[in-house]
From Swiss-Prot:
Family recorded in the similarity comment: Belongs to the ATPase protein 8 family.
GO terms for biological process, alphabetical: proton motive force-driven ATP synthesis
Membrane topology: Single-pass membrane protein
GO cellular component, one term: mitochondrial membrane
GO molecular function: proton transmembrane transporter activity
Keywords attached to this entry: ATP synthesis, CF(0), Hydrogen ion transport, Ion transport, Membrane, Mitochondrion, Transmembrane, Transmembrane helix, Transport
Protein name per its UniProtKB record: ATP synthase protein 8
Location(s) in or outside the cell: Mitochondrion membrane
Record's function text: Mitochondrial membrane ATP synthase (F(1)F(0) ATP synthase or Complex V) produces ATP from ADP in the presence of a proton gradient across the membrane which is generated by electron transport complexes of the respiratory chain. F-type ATPases consist of two structural domains, F(1) - containing the extramembraneous catalytic core and F(0) - containing the membrane proton channel, linked together by a central stalk and a peripheral stalk. During catalysis, ATP synthesis in the catalytic domain of F(1) is coupled via a rotary mechanism of the central stalk subunits to proton translocation.
Length: 54
């Protein structure tokens, strides 16, 4: 079995993890921003509809 050069494999390994981390972070930030936008809109709507709940 021939001896493989480890440098390209290490580079590809880190490149794949960098891409996966970037995509995961992008997905996570999009979910967080949508939930924050939804919650802020709900708070505004609730405060307008039910200003005095009792």
């Amino acid at each position: 079995m021939p001896q493989l050069n480890p440098i390209p494999w290490v580079f590809l390994f880190f490149l794949v993890w960098l891409v996966l981390g970037f995509l995961g972070l992008q997905k996570f930030t999009s979910i967080v921003t949508t939930t924050l936008d939804d919650s802020s809109e709900e708070v505004e709507v609730k405060s307008k509809e039910y200003s005095w709940p009792w």
